[in-house]
Amino acid sequence: LLHTVRSSFKSSHLESAKHLTMSMLYFYARKLEHLEKDKKKREIVFDRFCDDVRKFYKINRSIPFYSGRLAVSSKYLNDIVKEKTGITANEYIDRQTIIECKALLSSTDMSILKISLMMHFPSYSVFGKFFKRMTGMTPTEYREKTK
């Protein structure tokens, strides 16, 4: 297209060159408009994901749950979260979860089993492994350290 525009200018087909230039401007304006709409959509999806995580992380931490609620693919959701935060959607949910777990362990006398059930972990063992992976210590060690 650029080659055709240059040729038109050189061969003094000024009217053709003007039309080609206008076509190029229109093309790039439409492309920019599309990119802006996509960016806005991605921001909306990310904001809704964050809201949903705050509402549901205690009962559901699976990416398909969130992508289904947002009517997007799990990959698309993960790409957006990674673009916005630098971490995966799973990591985002895990970080939200560990904040709550730490708060419950340090500010309540609830048993660790009760906390794991309240946070909807399938078992005490799964909760313990999750907590250790996220913090480097067991729930008991964390509680003792923060008391």
Where are these regions (language model features)?
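All-alpha amphipathic helical-bundle segments outside canonical DNA-binding/catalytic cores
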Residues: S7-H19, K40
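N-terminal positioning helix adjacent to the helix-turn-helix/winged-helix DNA-binding module
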Residues: L20, K41-F49, T85, I93-T97
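Terminal helix-turn-helix DNA-binding modules in bacterial transcription factors
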Residues: E83-G128, E144-K147
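Append "Primarily bacterial transcriptional regulators
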Residues: F65-V72, L77, V81, I115-P122, ...
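Short acidic alpha-helical/loop segments enriched in Asp/Glu that coordinate divalent cations
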Residues: L35-R42, I63-F65
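Basic, amphipathic alpha-helical hairpins
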Residues: L2-S11, L25-L35, C50-S62, I80-T85, ...
